[in-house]
Amino acid sequence: MSTQRVFALADYLQPSDQEPVRSVVSRTQDTAIVAWHVKPGQHLPAHSHPSGQDTWVIMSGTGIYQLDKEGNTKIIKAGDVVIAPTGAVHGVYNHGTEPLVFAGVVAPAESGFELLG
C-alpha cells in the first residue's frame, strides 16, 4: 500500500488532441482519484456510474455540464464542486478558450461505467 498522501495534480495531466485522457492519480478499494485535462472543443460524453458517486473539483477553465439524460445543462467553472450521485447521467463540453482541468473522485473505485446512448 502506498504511503503517499499528497499529489500534484499537474503531474498527472495528459493533454491530448484526440479525446480527453483519464489519468489515475490514486486508486484504492474505496476510491479512484483521476485527473482530467479537457481542451477547448473537447467533451466527456454523457455517462453514469451505476454503483457509485462521481465528484469533480474544477481547478481551471469552464464547461457545459450535462445534468441528466434529458440533456439539461449548467455552466461549471474553476472553484466549483460537481456531484453526480450513484446512477446519475453526467458529462461535460469545454466551450471555453482554455483547458478545463479537474480532479474526479469516484467512490467506490469499482462503480462501473455506462455510456448514455
Q: Model-predicted segments: where are they?
A:
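A short, N-terminal "cap"/entry segment at the start of jelly-roll beta-barrel domains
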Residues: 1-34, 45-46, 114-117
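Intrinsic-disorder/low-complexity, polar/charged segments enriched in Ser/Thr/Lys/Arg/Asp/Glu/Gln
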Residues: 20, 31-33, 43, 62, ...
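Short histidine-centered beta-strand/loop micro-motifs
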Residues: 23-26, 35-36, 44-50, 67, ...
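Conserved hydrophobic/aromatic beta-strand scaffold that supports enzyme active sites
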Residues: 24, 33-37, 55, 73, ...
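A short beta-strand-loop-beta hairpin characteristic of the jelly-roll/cupin
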Residues: 53-78
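Ligand-binding loop in jelly-roll beta-barrel domains
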Residues: 64, 77-78, 86-112
